[in-house]
Amino acid sequence: MLSVGIPMALNYSITAIGTMILQSAVNVFGSSVVAAFTAASKVSNIATQTMPTLGTAMATYCGQNLGAGKHDRIFRGMKDAFYLCFFAAGAAALLCCLAGPTMVGWFIHNPSEQTLHAAMQYLHIASIFMLPLAWIFVYRNGLQGLDRGLVPMLSGVLELFSRYAVILIATKPFGYVGVCSADAAAWLTTGILLIVTYMTVSYTHLTLPTT
């Protein structure tokens, strides 16, 4: 239990640090942009609620089937979860893009045109990268369920580094759009790392299903 719980706790802590760094970068653009970014982040969190739920389910699923020695079920379950990621990401992206202006209004009363534009800039960029975000939840939790907690923990460090690097590199030439891209870059790099790690673990440490 500790081998799963400790990496999860560290990941949440690292993610919180990354969020604070990102918020600090946004603060320099003024109160209206800060309000827009905060509201857009809340909208994104609402739109992606299926992803952490799916991830938690996969952690339990992989752990139970690993303990039972049913590796074929792990393969099938993770394959199905991979395809579910497309559905979850597509639904989240559509919700952010189509209902984004209305949902931003839930958190900002009568937002100005500038504020709404800034919020939608973040949501449009985030929507493009919802798929790797879904991968993070599924494969990070799946690997932890398979008692492979090191890489999921290190993936949090990569996520933090990616955000910080994009903020340093892209903020000056691209301004607020560069800051909005920090989450997207973190999701993409971390999602790819976790998929590659799962593929390596599944084909080197698990018994391949017979056909």
Language-model features: locations:
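Helix-terminus/linker motif at the lipid-water interface of multi-pass membrane proteins
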Residues: 13-42, 46, 64, 102-112, ...
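Small-residue-rich hydrophobic transmembrane alpha-helices
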Residues: 36-94, 98-100, 133-155
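Hydrophobic/aromatic residues in alpha-helical transmembrane segments
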Residues: 18, 22, 58, 99-100, ...
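Hydrophobic faces of transmembrane alpha-helices in multi-pass small-molecule transporters and flippases
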Residues: 1-21, 46, 50, 54, ...
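Short alpha-helical transmembrane segments in multi-pass integral membrane proteins
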Residues: 1-6, 62-129, 170-206
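A short, hydrophobic C-terminal helix/tail in secreted or cell-surface proteins
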Residues: 207-211
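Short runs within selected transmembrane alpha-helices of multi-pass transporters and secretion channels
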Residues: 55, 126-145, 151-163, 179-195
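Transmembrane alpha-helical segments of integral membrane proteins
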Residues: 163-169
